[in-house]
C-alpha cells in the first residue's frame, strides 16, 4: 500500500474509535484499487450483524455476506465493521437492512458488481434471507447481476438451526 492511498482513511490504526449505535453511512471509507485492470472478487463475512425489529424492538441477528468486484475503489474493512455495527440499535426490517447496505456500498465504491446476502436467525420459526445485487449499468456486470439474481438460490442450502 502506498502512503498516499491512506490519506483519506481516518479510522484505520486508531486505538480509540467511538462506536456509533445508530445507522451512520458516513462512517464508510474507501481507498484506491491498485489493480483496476483485473476482475477479482472481494468477500466479507460478518457473522455478528445485529439490528432491531421496528415493531417489537427485539434484536435480530444475522450473518451478512458481502461480495464485490471492485472498479476504482475498495471499502476499508474497519469502516465497514463500524458501519455494520451502526445498525445495532437501528429499527428496520431484514429486507430493508440488506438493501440499504447494498446501496450504501454502491454509492461509496461504484463497483463493477456487488451482492449482499443476509442470513438472519429464525424468529417465530422462520428465517429470512434477503439478497441484494447490483451490476454496473451498460456493462457485462449488469447481465451478470441479473443472472445471479435469477439463480442465486437455485439449490437452497439445507436449513439447520443456525
Swiss-Prot record:
Question: Any idea which residues are catalytic in this one?
Answer: 53, 60
Localization of this protein? Cytoplasm
Mind telling me which SUPFAM superfamilies this protein's record contains? Answer: Tetrahydrobiopterin biosynthesis enzymes-like
Pfam families tied to this protein: QueF (PF14489)
Main localization (coarse)? cytoplasm
Q: Which Gene3D superfamilies match?
A: 3.30.1130.10
Q: What Enzyme Commission number(s) does the record list for this chain?
A: 1.7.1.13
Catalytic activities:
7-aminomethyl-7-carbaguanine + 2 NADP(+) = 7-cyano-7-deazaguanine + 2 NADPH + 3 H(+)
Q: What Gene Ontology biological process does one annotation of this record name?
A: queuosine biosynthetic process
Q: Which UniProt keywords apply?
A: Cytoplasm, NADP, Oxidoreductase, Queuosine biosynthesis
Q: Which PANTHER family match?
A: NADPH-DEPENDENT 7-CYANO-7-DEAZAGUANINE REDUCTASE
Q: Kindly provide the name given to this protein in its UniProt entry.
A: NADPH-dependent 7-cyano-7-deazaguanine reductase
Species of origin? Exiguobacterium sibiricum (strain DSM 17290 / CCUG 55495 / CIP 109462 / JCM 13490 / 255-15)
Amino acid at each position: 500500500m502506498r502512503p498516499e492511498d491512506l490519506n483519506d482513511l481516518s479510522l484505520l490504526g486508531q486505538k480509540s474509535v467511538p462506536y456509533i449505535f445508530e445507522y451512520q453511512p458516513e462512517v464508510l471509507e474507501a481507498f484506491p484499487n491498485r489493480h483496476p485492470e483485473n476482475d477479482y472478487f472481494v468477500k466479507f463475512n460478518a457473522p455478528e450483524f445485529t439490528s432491531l425489529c421496528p415493531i417489537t424492538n427485539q434484536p435480530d441477528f444475522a450473518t451478512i455476506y458481502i461480495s464485490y468486484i471492485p472498479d476504482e475503489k475498495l471499502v476499508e474493512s474497519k469502516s465497514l465493521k463500524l458501519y455494520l455495527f451502526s445498525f445495532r440499535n437501528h429499527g428496520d426490517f431484514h429486507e430493508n437492512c440488506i438493501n440499504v447496505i447494498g446501496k450504501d456500498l454502491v454509492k461509496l465504491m461504484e463497483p463493477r458488481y456487488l451482492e449482499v446476502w443476509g442470513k438472519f436467525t429464525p424468529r417465530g420459526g422462520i428465517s429470512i434471507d434477503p439478497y441484494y445485487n447490483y451490476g454496473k449499468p451498460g456493462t457485462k456486470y449488469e447481465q451478470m447481476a441479473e443472472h445471479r439474481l435469477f439463480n442465486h438460490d437455485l439449490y437452497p442450502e439445507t436449513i439447520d438451526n443456525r
